[in-house]
Amino acid sequence: MNKVVWFEIPFDESERAQKFYKDVFGWQINHFPDMDYYAAITTDTDPHTMEPKEAGAINGGLLKRDDTGKHPVILIEVPSIDEHLKKIEQNGGKTVMLKVMVGNFGLYARVSDTEGNVIGLWEKIKQPQ
């Protein structure tokens, strides 16, 4: 079974969105300028793996709204994005954003399901111990 591991919330104005999530929920917002992306840290995170310490908790991100992400998106971790893109197409879904490398963390793609909902796929890259 594949689990939800991340979320993304689009914004139109980054400063306004950052302030909202900091002030309302107490989230820590970290900017990744090379990707124009903001990590939304919602729980204590292991500094080595960047994964939440609390079982069942997830962190996420804030990003500029675009055509593939007009609404919040959940990311589901899969062992192979390529295999899941094929499964999605075979089951009536569509690829809306091709696979891209995200830093040295993993691979990411966006798909739509049979109902038009956009979902992110995440393939984690194994980090050296």
Predicted features along the sequence, with ranges:
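N-terminal beta-strand motif that seeds the catalytic metal site of vicinal oxygen chelate
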Residues: M1-K19, H71-I74, E123-Q129
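Core segments of cupin and vicinal oxygen chelate
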Residues: E8-G56
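Vicinal oxygen chelate
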Residues: D12-S14, I74-V118
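Conserved catalytic-core motifs of GNAT/GCN5-like acyltransferases
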Residues: Q28-D34, K99-V102, K126-Q129
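Short acidic/glycine-enriched loop/turn segments that link adjacent beta-strands
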Residues: D34-Y37, T68-K70, V102-L107
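Active-site beta-strand termini and strand-to-loop segments that position acidic
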Residues: I41-D44, V111-T114, K124
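Short, charged/polar surface micro-motifs in flexible loops or helix N-caps
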Residues: D44-P47, D67-G69, S80-D82
